[in-house]
């Protein structure tokens, strides 16, 4: 459970142990988001079009919680992204929403918890469940 939302954690711990370091290093935000994109694609491939998007929702929620703790995103923005992501029914829409979230986060100031466009402004053309 410690790795929920922190896909990079097992590898970082292994690297730290191999190097004799007492602290695992948190990767850059861009690397965390890249790993989430890979993970999302694999989830969809493994679980298929019906279960994949449903299972991906909790994984995305864990990522957003982790990013909130890291102060990479505000709790309010994380909540808005989660609500939007949870309404998406297709793998394609989820991947596109993650891409737009990644773009928004990467363009925000790295020194503060960013305030980014709310998902409905970024993903208006995506099909969402009513």
Report residues per predicted region.
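Alpha/beta catalytic cores of nucleotide-metabolism and tRNA/nucleoside-modifying enzymes
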Residues: 1-130
């Amino acid at each position: 459970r410690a790795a929920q939302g922190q896909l990079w954690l097992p590898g970082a711990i292994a690297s730290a142990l191999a190097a004799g370091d007492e602290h695992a290093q948190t990767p850059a935000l861009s690397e965390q988001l890249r790993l989430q994109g890979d993970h999302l694609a694999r989830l969809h491939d493994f679980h298929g079009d019906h279960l994949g998007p449903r299972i991906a929702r909790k994984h995305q929620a864990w990522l957003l919680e982790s990013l909130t703790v890291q102060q990479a995103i505000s709790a309010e923005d994380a909540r808005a992204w989660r609500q939007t992501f949870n309404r998406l029914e297709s793998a394609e829409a989820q991947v596109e929403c993650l891409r737009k979230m990644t773009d928004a986060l990467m363009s925000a100031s790295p020194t503060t918890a960013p305030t980014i466009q709310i998902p409905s402004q970024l993903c208006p053309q995506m099909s969402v469940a009513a």
